């Protein structure tokens, strides 16, 4: 656990130096929440165990979610293009971001999260990863109604809806 904490501290320091400017800041507290949240998710392929994020994965996820404007505290990035080679986890990263936003953004009520991709098969695979993250975590599962046949997930407490 200490190694993980030291690693996280080093990553946070590096990203804070990179993003802290007069106009933007790197929200370290939210980055810690993201790290903790992801560490509670389990892999949907291979051995079903909790994730150990790699540095590049943490950097991509938190640069999208944790870089904010100083003026109003809103995220700098409203859209993101993840450009990494095939079979390096783009869908995995997208699923983490979607699940984090679906569950951890308290000010979002009745939102519609739509998963899209180049093909229906890719969108279905992304949905399958999101669904696995939720079903494998009893805390997340408790807050949702999952309808696999229509590929729809509805939050019971705030009415947010995720669908393909």
For every predicted segment, state its role:
Residues 1-164:
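Phosphate/NTP-binding elements of NTP-utilizing enzymes
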């Amino acid at each position: 656990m200490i190694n993980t904490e030291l690693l996280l501290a080093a990553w946070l320091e590096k990203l804070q130096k990179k993003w802290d400017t007069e106009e933007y800041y790197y929200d370290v507290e939210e980055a810690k929440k993201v790290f903790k949240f992801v560490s509670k998710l389990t892999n949907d392929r291979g051995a079903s165990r909790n994730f150990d994020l790699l540095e590049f994965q943490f950097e991509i996820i938190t640069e999208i979610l944790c870089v904010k404007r100083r003026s109003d505290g809103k995220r700098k990035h409203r859209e993101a293009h993840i450009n990494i080679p095939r079979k390096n986890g783009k869908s995995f990263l997208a699923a983490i971001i979607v699940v984090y936003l679906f569950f951890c953004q308290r000010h979002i009520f009745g939102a519609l999260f739509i998963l899209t991709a180049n093909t229906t098969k890719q969108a279905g695979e992304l949905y399958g990863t999101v669904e696995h993250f939720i079903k494998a975590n009893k805390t997340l599962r408790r807050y949702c109604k999952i309808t696999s046949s229509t590929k729809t997930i509805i939050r019971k407490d705030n009415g947010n809806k995720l669908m393909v």
